[in-house]
Amino acid sequence: MESTFYPYLGALGWIGLFLLIGTIIRAKVKFFQTFLFPASLIGGIIGFFVLNAGWLGIPSSTGWKTITPVTFSTITFHLFAFGFVGIGLLQAKSGTSGKVVARGALWIALIFGLLFSVQAMVGKGTFDVWKLLFGGDFFTGNGYLLGAGFTQGPGQTQAYASIWETTYQISNSLNVGLAFAAVGFLVAGIVGVPLAFYGIRKGWISVEGGKLPNCFLRGLMDKGDNPTCARSTTHPANIDSVAFHLAIMATLYALAYAFGVWWLCTMPKGINGLGIGMIFAWGMFFAMIARKLMAKFDLIHLIDGETTRRLTGATVDFMICAVFMGIQVRQLQEVAIPFVIAVVLGSLATLFICLWFGRRSPEHGFERGLTLFGYCTGTAASGLLLLRIVDPDFDTPVAVEVGLMNVFATILFKPISWSMPFVPVEGFPMFWIFVAVTLITPITMYFLKMIKKPAF
């Protein structure tokens, strides 16, 4: 049985330890409270240095066994895909209707696609120019992963990069993509938090900002203040409610895997790699079908939204921490300088676009722009953390808009998300797809009257 702990159970143990360390540091250190760094980010950064120093492993009867970054990359992939099963089971919260909310959600979805396109072109352009001027043996298409890493986060980036490496034998895509995603979290906090407070001082916010509660800053609830986070839908004499929800998600994930294998074995070469690479999409698809069927047979009450959110949130925390430990510094050395340049230029471009369109938004411009900056450098959670600074009680509808925007993005973002796996195909017009999105988006927003005179 000893051998079964290596490498994945040992890796999960390390992730858990770093999450606990991150939780303690967030609760005690003012710097991390000021910049709202979550425990998963703090723990991941620590884990990154421990792993790349060669200290990370587990003891065994034959001695110390080192755990490699590949193990954590694999864990990242599965946590991301499993979390999407939970997303598919979730129902949108009530109160998401209304003209302003729908317009705001569409506004965010359009800028989301624009930012991905601009970031990707900045990354690719930087890698191309560097290789032209200084040479190097690396695939410049990996620069496109700046857009995926910043805008879509580590899980989706992992999916794209895995397809590139397994189907087209592109080297170092996974490492570069995860590094872009990891640095994006830092950008969201280091740039986004000062921007939020600057906006408050300048009076750019729509509502009067309040003081953030200590429990929010520390990341730990006060003694006696323990809100309920789930409802039981089964009797514990039969099956625990959390076990029941996990059973549903595990079954759906298994179905997604089976479908992915079928795709891999039956589809033509070149697109068959999407079978496993897009397992997160298949999982979400089967989860949405399962939810519809349960509603049809009057069983939907057995799915508790809060339980599903907690399980999905747990996968995200473990995933973010694992992302940093999936990065190998040695493999980044060849592209280190263009990588840093791309991150800086991409961050500046993201900041400019968010503020430019935010100033001209029909309403709640700063809140939308700030939230989008966090979203399109980190994750949706990063964006909502920044929003909480300027809108502590979520009096504006922006938080709801962020959730609803996925409805629009599901349709609007398809040309990009379904094209990214084919970037390594010679002659594939990925660059021109990004150019088209970049040109069409502002024109569309203008005709939809989403661009007004600057409000701040």
Residue ranges and their predicted role:
Residues V29-L36, S60-S73, L90-L110, A295-R309, ...:
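Interfacial helix-loop-helix linkers and transmembrane-helix boundary segments
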Residues M249-F357:
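Transmembrane helical segments that form the transport core of multi-pass membrane transport proteins
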Residues M1-F5, L12, Y198-A243, A295-L299, ...:
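Intrinsically disordered, low-complexity non-transmembrane regions of multi-pass membrane transporters
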Residues F31-T34, Q91-A105, K131-T140, S162-N175, ...:
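Juxtamembrane helix-boundary/capping and inter-helix hinge elements in multi-pass membrane proteins
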Residues M319-A322, I327-V329, F339, V344-K452:
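C-terminal transmembrane helix pair
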Residues F18, I45-N52, V70-A102, M284-M294, ...:
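Hydrophobic transmembrane alpha-helices of secondary-active transporters
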Residues K93-K124, A181, H245, M249, ...:
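Entry/N-cap segments of selected transmembrane alpha helices
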Residues V118, T126, F134-I170, L195, ...:
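Alpha-helical membrane segments and immediately flanking helix-loop junctions
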